[in-house]
């Protein structure tokens, strides 16, 4: 059985890569064969004309993959902007078919494939110039891949609105949602919002909370895996 998830977030910088890394390490600790993709990465480091995707490189390391970065991150852009804007500036096509070729290749190799998106659901990826106003968004990519979603959200003020809006946008496209994970991308403030938001979200949404990831001070493989197993509903994640 080939299975997997699409990891998206309520916004840019919410911690999708860290959460994806945590799930990867927990699956590996359970003895599962798991791979990862960062389908598009902007803000890549240009080293002697070669674009290096830091998120894609981290995921390859966390998953202990020996696959090419061209498979793990098939679209790499230098400017830290939305793919649509960055690709126009750099005059590089965001080739959706290229993403799917890489996706299908990796799916055949792994029992589970974790696919991390870019930004939030409504980040534009490209536009078919022959079709008036025909934009292709992250949400369309998720729909076409057919993977259930794990939503990464924040514990901080504003997360209730962002989480509900994102879940509503997924529902409108009839995209399956496995659940959400609350990620502390910064040290806990222990304010009222952080203390109350997790429970309020549980009351408001009809998909389960799969865990709360505390702030990680270091990206140590063993530490991330242990933290994930301790804080995530691993059995629910493994069971599609």
Curated annotation (Swiss-Prot):
Its cofactor is Mg(2+). SUPFAM superfamilies: P-loop containing nucleoside triphosphate hydrolases (SSF52540). ATP binds at residues 13-18, 55, 116-119, 214-216. Pathway: Cofactor biosynthesis; biotin biosynthesis; biotin from 7,8-diaminononanoate: step 1/2. It catalyses: (7R,8S)-7,8-diammoniononanoate + CO2 + ATP = (4R,5S)-dethiobiotin + ADP + phosphate + 3 H(+). Keywords: ATP-binding, Biotin biosynthesis, Cytoplasm, Ligase, Magnesium, Metal-binding, Nucleotide-binding. GO terms for molecular function: ATP binding; dethiobiotin synthase activity; magnesium ion binding. The active site is at residue 38. InterPro entries: DTB_synth_BioD, P-loop_NTPase. It comes from the Bacteria. Catalyzes a mechanistically unusual reaction, the ATP-dependent insertion of CO2 between the N7 and N8 nitrogen atoms of 7,8-diaminopelargonic acid (DAPA, also called 7,8-diammoniononanoate) to form a ureido ring. Homodimer. Belongs to the dethiobiotin synthetase family. This is ATP-dependent dethiobiotin synthetase BioD.
